[in-house]
């Protein structure tokens, strides 16, 4: 089952990211498309909220993606919206490996 494999992969990545963040291996943790993983239940939402509330001092966390949950917005220091003005897709260029995915 594709969803089950994806969920397992995301959970492994989530655990890896938490471990790196908690052991001081990084000053900044960037999790691209985090909002989609959260929205589709690919990572444990309550665990993510707890981590963000208790993250190590000095650690900057950047979460990207569309439609963040209200509780993520509430605990965030910054929330930005980015809108597309122009994109190669508009000219028929489809998603490219290493760029859009």
In which residue ranges do the predicted regions lie?
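Phosphate-binding/switch region of NTP-binding enzymes
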Residues: 68-101
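Conserved alpha-helical scaffold flanking the Walker A/P-loop in AAA+ ATPase domains
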Residues: 14-22
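Short, small-residue-biased leader/transition segments that mark boundaries at the very start
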Residues: 2-3
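Walker B catalytic acidic pair
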Residues: 32-34
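A conditional alpha-helix N-cap/helix-loop micro-motif detector
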Residues: 7-11, 41-44
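Catalytic-core regions built around general acid/base machinery
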Residues: 46-58, 71
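Conserved ATPase-coupling elements of RecA-like P-loop NTPase cores
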Residues: 36-47, 72-73
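Loop/turn-to-beta-strand initiation segments
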Residues: 25-28, 56-63
